[in-house]
């Protein structure tokens, strides 16, 4: 993984799984969770194979160590060759002097189901001590804190950030600054003297007295004497959970004092920004920090999203993100965008790289406008241009409304559309997406044999039209009566262009003339979505057969790879 990176992909593609795996190895507080792993951490929930426990093994190699880390982990240092992307496994010792070689720390997690205890177990180790003949040495909590790995699952977890619960961001800061609040005894003593609702007129004390009288008929009076309501359990652990920070809300009492609310009651964006401020403090305290952050865009406007990314990158040794936001993704170089894909439990990541024909100076704009959605999807449909993009997406949505029991919409099929801008770029784009492990579809005009063959090799599902342009695909395939009605409606609504007034559609117009004048109209309106508007105007039987059959074929291909839902069994 490069110094900084963003992992992108469809939902459930494995982005969070990757971060969870690293957290199992390096998270200081992760092993305190009980159990440390469970049934669902195993592929398909299978933690036994023929009554033999299945092992979960995770290995992480950390490079770019600070001088303090090199000293602290001195006995466990190995050597990493950046050019080969591998550890140096043996002599000669002089190989460690190469410029491309640097110290590395290899760490491992091993976990499994324990048959004897009927429970799951797991532990982290310095990986080199797991070699045969060596004594395994634990990678302990103190060691993990020296690695500086911080995992923020999503900013929605901010409800604990400013509490004093163990593992909260505020607690981490206090530990790192070696601040130990000597307040618990004072607070507990104060709270012990506070009773709630003791006044008889409130009626609560009378009820508690009745409870005591009822209990005395069952157990001795010493066992349940003088019930009272207290502020908390009066333990340090419970105080950690209930104490929280209050902040000004912007509202004021009549006496001019500001009304304070628990910080979690602030706006979501404010809470998220507070969390990031705490992370910034942590980064300032530690020399080497590796941030792993999920979806930093939640509840933040685009300009704040960008600021978050730049701030975290600036303050960390390495920053890793997951995201679905184009404003986050465009902040990274093409090789820093890692596209995650998963097939039958096998997880792969490939750098997005530079899309074909896109120049570096236009990368950010093109990423946001054309490519971001397709990088996040499992399946991609390539169209030649914007008009084709609009026509096929409109037709698919129309068919979805007509057949709600099916899955015709590209959104429901998990397919992102991307336009190639020209027929010669369909094949290069297909290769670009297939390299990332995506299923690639392409709909294109009738082509010469050479271009057709290149496209067929480059994509998984090619669909070639019978005409040499999208206008002809629609005009020659649409129902003639529907086309005339649409043309007459344009005239009636005063939407027919004045320079074509002598050729305006009229009742009884021959199809050849209608075809010619409507083609001129659509050429004039190219890029305005007029052709897609015609598709929206048509009923299913009036739509071009090539378009409807292609959409149904795409639907069928998606479900042929899965268990076919009952609603679409049989022929389409």
Predicted feature descriptions by range:
Residues 1-27, 246-373, 559-572:
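Switch/communication elements of ASCE P-loop NTPase nucleotide-binding domains
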Residues 5-6, 150, 380:
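Conserved beta-strand position immediately N-terminal to the Walker
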Residues 10, 48-53, 98-102, 142-145, ...:
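Conserved catalytic network of the ASCE P-loop NTPase/AAA+ motor domain
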Residues 369-382, 386-572:
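Acidic, Mg2+-coordinating catalytic modules of nucleic-acid enzymes
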Residues 161-164, 173-274, 278-290:
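Extended helical coiled-coil dimerization/tether regions that scaffold
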Residues 65-186:
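Electropositive, glycine-dotted interaction segments
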Residues 20-101:
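Conserved P-loop NTP-binding catalytic core
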Residues 54-58, 103-107, 145-149, 317, ...:
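Short glycine-/polar-rich loops that comprise or flank the Walker A/P-loop
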